[in-house]
Amino acid sequence: MSHTPHNRRHESERLSATIRFLGNLLGDVIREQAGEAAFQLVERLRTLGKELRNGAPDRADAELRMMAARMTVADIQIVIKAFNAYFLLVNLAEQMQRVWVLRDRERKYPDTPRPESIAAAIAELHACGIPATTIQEWLDTACIQPVFTAHPTEARRRTALEKVRRLATLLDERTGDLHGFVREENTMRIREEIVSLWQTDEVRVVKPTVIDEVKNGMFYFESGLFDLIPRLYRELEYALRTTYPTHEWRVPPLLRYGAWMGGDRDGNPNVTHTVTIQAVRMMRAAAIERHIAAVEELSHRLGQSVRQAPVSDELRESLAHDASLFPEVADMLARRNPYELYRQKCTYIREKLIRTLDYARTASLDWGRSDSPPKGAYFSRTDLLDDLHVMERSLLSNNAAIVANGALRDLIRQAEVFGLHTATLDIRQHSERHTAALAEVLAAAGVCADYTALNEIERIELLSREIENPRPLIPTRLDYSPDTVEVIATFRAVASILERLSPEAVETCIVSMTRGASDLLAPLLLAKEAGLFRPFRFSRLSMAPLFETGADLACCDEVLEACMRLPIYRNHLALRGFVQEVMIGYSDSNKDVGYAAANWAIYQAQRKLRDFGRRHGIQMRLFHGRGGAIGRGGGPANHAILAQPPGSIGNQIKITEQGEVIADRYGLPLLAHRHIEQVINAVLRAGLLQRDDPPDEWTQALERLAALSQRHYRALVYERSDFVPYFRNVTPIAEISRLNIGSRPASRRNTERIEDLRAIPWVFSWMQSRHTLPGWYGLGFALETFVYAGEQSDASGSAIDRLALLQEMYARWSFFRVMIDNAQMILGKADLHIASRYAELAPDQNAAAAIFAAIREEYQRASRMIRQVARIERLLDNAPVLQHSIQRRNPYIDPMSYLQIELLRRLRAAPDGPDHAAIEDAILLSISGLAAGLMNTG
């Protein structure tokens, strides 16, 4: 499928026209809402932003600084509001452009699979000789699970998301043949939405609660995902059927969704066991309400009469059983729909769902109670699916296959994927919290006076013994410290949820900072005490280690080997189907050792985990904890999947959908479809196409690059005493920590140490201050030293040979190419001139100048070396769409940075001044605007 320069020019012109149209409407709204003077101020700053890049930069810089210093806080707020609105509209225009390009290509090449689509993956598998039986075996146990997370720096509110969705629909209408009144009416509706946006608080006035974050996450399920999933399965079935026409395909529900909102309590004291229960109730209600609406619609469609077409005996028996559960409904149906048995069945399903919904909202989940769902209510997805399959089999056996494969089949797919719980909630907690809780419990029980003083071997022996001991360790009534009570109550809440409310609502306990086998045995003991684990009988909760520092990634297989030597852990794993989930943390590893070293540590860890699984015959399910920003493992998801080590994915994978990129990936239904199909495409190809491990020469080169990069990164971040003050003073980290952005604190502990700072605000702060340091620092030094000072990195050959080696790796090794391209992208979003203005916020200018000089030198080195390795003249020459997008945004981003710097200066100079609250509001607006403009947060 060719994409000619003519096509690209047409697409670029259409995008420019859309942005111009929206920008003109926004200008009119600014005049109308804020006045002509405000409009002229915005225009002057925008003009200076352009001159800063393309005209007289020194003069523009001086005037921008002078104007920022003289503006009132009220004027600054209006300007930032205008730029925020512009970025929202530009982002929407770019999203719609992607929609239109996809649609144009489908229209132009209807018989050619879209690149990176499901059909393209199946065609490639067929071309490579992969037999249908191999694909079927892969599908039978496949699990692809995107996991939605909240994000402390995601400032978009649900009300804004809904307005953007309406704007998207209106913009899409303009691609049709609109004339006269209809076109004018469309323009007025768009303007109406822009006015409404202008008059709406675009960021939160009060700090969001965890439940607010759950509601925000549910928006994407309710507004698109429920409807989207059946189409994706139809596309997969069609691709398989047409490419392998002789095989009878079974396509199980390989796609499932997960969530962290309400379950991730690591470092967030606001996520309590009661909040987790509330989140589960909300997600269960969302799924059930959606199924009720779907079954009502299905009832309208299934009006077949037994006088016209027979039904199965199985359906009649099912209806008789339903009538015994709902006699009043049965009487009503006998009068109203005596011959329409499918409608009768739909009515009973609806009644069961309503009863299930009532129970989900009101059921007591106190631990230790023996309540169960009322008669006629569904408990699991299987119960609902059993009823739906009864109708399906009856239709299939009575000449109505086309009906069975319509709306009913769609509802079956929705029930398979979303069940009665929408998404499976992960429970994440720091290993130290489990350790501290057990130390108190063991001491109180007289088992061990000081558990924390034990070495790893002693801990393992003690925990194994206690797990195997049938006597309760923890009494029913909890008389411990509040922290310990909360840890125990969390496991008890999970037990109550799984036993009495929703058996699929929670599946995994993720243990942050796992360092040894005892860190997995500790929650297993707590699970046993809550009734979630009975050796040799059942285990209802998987234990997933999270390896997130460079050192922990390096020994990840050793930790699991230690677990496998323990009979009690092997028994737990057997009860979980010999599936071992392991989460790999991209964020903290990057903060720990730097971008390049973290990428390589993660790659190596995956190879070790792959080999571990093969040695023990265990299905490994790797959970990739990627952030949206490059400094936290971000970038295109499908490219990242294909860049993983050969054989490391298999057919099971979990990937985080971080809060800050969910809106971009799932905000519009067609883009959500595109994102999910790209993920499925990548997992199919990575799991089924044979790939060899990279040559030793390449891996040896990466070993050297990683070591050099880590050394250079840590020399700046951890070994210079003046670095932490620089970071605290020249970025808005202090303000980000205080403002109403997310429910979670910015640090795990109340310290100034980089080690204790969460990775998200770490990356976010550098992005806001235009340094973007976590996404590239150390890489330039490593590349340059490897190529031009080979003797320092033990590399052989000449500089020309070593550069040629890196160029070959870039061309032929997807892992290395993705690593370089992601760094290139984040370098393209950096601006060291504006970063130098942030550096002026530091009280100690001599120390700040020294730090900034090191950062600038590394930026120049990284830019230069990446251009050489990728064989391009300018950064992003090989990504022109992104390059143009950045160029289009800079005239608006740059003035906002100047205004943010001025606001930070004023707030820090007079933290208790009369304008304190207004300045904080303006800073929050600027944070939101810069995040939208840069299209990266944390």
From Swiss-Prot:
In the record, the note on similarity to other proteins reads: Belongs to the PEPCase type 1 family.
Enzyme Commission no = 4.1.1.31
Key word Membrane present = no
Q: What does this protein do?
A: Forms oxaloacetate, a four-carbon dicarboxylic acid source for the tricarboxylic acid cycle.
What keywords were assigned to this record? Carbon dioxide fixation, Lyase, Magnesium
Q: Which organism is it from?
A: Roseiflexus castenholzii (strain DSM 13941 / HLO8)
UniProt keyword Nucleotide-binding, yes or no: no
Active site annotated at which positions?
H151, K591
Top-rank EC class of the record's enzyme? lyase
Origin, by domain of life?
Answer: Bacteria
UniProt lineage: Bacteria, Bacillati, Chloroflexota, Chloroflexia, Chloroflexales
GO BP, one annotated term: tricarboxylic acid cycle
**Which prosthetic group or cofactor does it need?**
Mg(2+)
Q: Name one GO molecular function term.
A: phosphoenolpyruvate carboxylase activity
Q: Which reaction does it catalyse?
A: oxaloacetate + phosphate = phosphoenolpyruvate + hydrogencarbonate
Name of the protein in its database record = Phosphoenolpyruvate carboxylase
Which Gene Ontology cellular component terms are annotated?
cytosol
Check the record and name the InterPro entries matching this protein.
PEP_COase, PEP_COase_bac/pln-type, PEP_COase_Lys_AS, Pyrv/PenolPyrv_kinase-like_dom
